């Protein structure tokens, strides 16, 4: 059985821009920055002679984002970035002040789908933006504990 959510892996094309987004703008702490290569790595991911720079950026609850920039294989753009595309769609972070986050990130050129919106059915505000490579990132500000999250 699964005991805990650990991380989300994000393939990036410019590690420095991604570190700026996830660490400088969102406040993740850069935990490690290393090169992954060798037989183990290539076998694990199914790419011959793979090498990648990996940065793990953590949140206070112990989960982290694993940023991966391949140095031996060209990054393949997704077939679509539409919200209804099948598969892993977005990563979501809980934040304390979504309006301030939106203002700060917008002023730094981050593209948002919309301003933060109040949910019609839960005491939350939420919005989506795009990271430097177009990955959808959601933010949620929770005004009061959600009953279904308490169980």
Model-based region annotation:
Residues 31-33, 115, 139:
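Residue-level detector of high-confidence beta-strand sites
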Residues 3-7, 52, 86-90:
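Short, solvent-exposed beta-strand edge segments and adjacent coil->beta transition regions
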Residues 145-151:
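A short, polar/charged loop-to-alpha-helix boundary motif
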Residues 12-16, 59-63, 69-136:
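Vicinal oxygen chelate
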